[in-house]
Every structure is written in structure tokens, then in C-alpha cells.
Amino acid sequence: MASLKDMRVRIASTKATQKITKAMQMVAASKLRRAQTAAEAARPYADKMSAVISNIAGAAAGSPGAPALLAGTGRDQVHLLLVCTGERGLSGAFNSSIVRLARERALALMAQGKEVKFFCVGRKGYEQLRRQFDKQIVEHLDLRSVRQLGFVNAEDIAKKVLARFEAGEFDVCTLFYSRFRSVIAQIPTAQQIIPLVVEEGTAASTTSYEYEPEEDEILTRLLPRNLAVQIFRALLENNASFYGAQMSAMDNATRNAGEMIRKQTLVYNRTRQAQITKELIEIISGAEAV
């Protein structure tokens, strides 16, 4: 059995850990408010951008001059999985849930005879995926040096993806990220971004519009920007999801530390009481012997 001194050291260590997890919980809660506001503010713009493009694309999708970002390459053989995760851990299942969804999609595609490539944004996803798909990771982008996520970061990713598409390196690109719903609910999401999936209801709209310039020219300008907008939205959703998951994880860790301290203190008090009782018995026995 551990000595009383060892028990005191263990209790003090657990209390120190509890202070750290509590501080991390408070920091995550503070950052979550800003991240959640940014993610929710980006949703209407991203949704409206998709709706406008879908409306225009409904008439242009079948035309010979339709942009490749809309019409695709005509093949479905090479898939690029754009996996966006966090740069840090201590966030529960946030990173692993995104990686799990991407891994399942990759294995399903490979089982169908498709070729799969990975573009990893974020250190944690890259570290997990390279254990199984090291040779299939074509690019890894580290955002640890970025203090504040901006549209320029999404544009940089979009340009890299677009350059690979124009070079004929893949046919389909799917974006993986975590959609923020609440502090305790982050939804791993897969969204096809190349070629753009046109919403059926919008594409079938009977409302007729006249466009100036022509639909194909408008789409040629809008589609690359929409790619960056959807990636930016995913980064913001991921950021909010990360802080929500971290806040929840640190809250659980703080509660668990409190329970451990309670149990350790109980064992310490019982051991101390037993030791005092033993010493008293020895003193009494010695007095009686005299």
C-alpha cells in the first residue's frame, strides 16, 4: 500500500491537473463564442451562393460549353478527398470522427476499383491518415501558424485543389469537415465540391431568367469563388466544432478529476485513520504491559 506521503503527492498532482483542465475549458468557452458567431454568419452566404449557382447551372449543365467544375471530366475514376481537421488534440472525438468518415469513404471507393488521393488540411488528420494511406496523400497543409482564419486561407486551399483538377489529377473532389450544431453535437460531414452537385429542386425551376453575360461565362467566374466559399465555410464550421468539442472534453476531464480527488482523499483519510488507530493500540498495549 502507498504511504501517506505518496497519497498526498498523488492528490496534489490530480488537483493541479484539474486546474489545467478547468482553465482550458474556460479558454475554449471564450473562443467558442467567437468561432460559433463566425460559423453561423458564414452559412447564409455559402447557402445563397450555392443556390444562385445551382439556379444558373440548371440551364447550363448540359451545354457543350459548361465549365468543367460543373460538368466534370466525364469520368469517375480518381477521387480526391479534401480532409479538414484540427491542428491540436484534447478535443474528444472531433478529429477522429472526421478521419473515420474519410477512411470509410476511401475504403468504399477503393473496393469499387477507384483511385483515391488525399489532401489533408490540419495536422491531426494528416497524422492519422498517413498510417494507412501515406503514399496516397498528395498534399498536406499545416495551419498552426495561422492566428485568425480568413478567406485568404480558403482561397489558398481552393487554388491548390483547382490547379490539381486542371492538371487532370482527379475527377471528383469531396470535402470532409465537422459541421457545428452545439457544444455536445458536431456532425462529421462529406460534401462533393467538384463537380458541383446541382440541387434538383433549383435546377428544375420553371422560372426563366435572362443573364448578361451568358450563363457559361458567369459560371466560369463564380464556380472558383464558390469553391473557396465552401472551403471557408468548412474551416469556420471546423473551428467552432473544435472549441465546442474541447470545451465538452475539458469539462468531462474536470469532473473526472474531481471524482478522483474525492476517492483519493477518502482512501487517504481511511489509511491515516487506520494508522492512528494502530499507533494508539500499540501505546495502550505497551502501557498495559508495564
UniProtKB/Swiss-Prot annotation:
GO terms (BP aspect): proton motive force-driven ATP synthesis; proton motive force-driven plasma membrane ATP synthesis
Lipid bilayer topology: Peripheral membrane protein
Pfam families: ATP-synt
SUPFAM superfamilies the record matches: ATP synthase (F1-ATPase), gamma subunit
Subcellular location: Cell inner membrane
Principal location listed in the UniProt entry: membrane
GO cellular component entries: plasma membrane; proton-transporting ATP synthase complex
Keyword check for Transport: yes
Molecular function per GO: ATP binding; proton-transporting ATP synthase activity, rotational mechanism
Keyword Membrane assigned: yes
Keywords: ATP synthesis, Cell inner membrane, Cell membrane, CF(1), Hydrogen ion transport, Ion transport, Membrane, Transport
Quaternary structure note: F-type ATPases have 2 components, CF(1) - the catalytic core - and CF(0) - the membrane proton channel. CF(1) has five subunits: alpha(3), beta(3), gamma(1), delta(1), epsilon(1). CF(0) has three main subunits: a, b and c.
Primary role: Produces ATP from ADP in the presence of a proton gradient across the membrane. The gamma chain is believed to be important in regulating ATPase activity and the flow of protons through the CF(0) complex.
Family as reported in the entry's similarity comment: Belongs to the ATPase gamma chain family.
Stated name of the protein: ATP synthase gamma chain
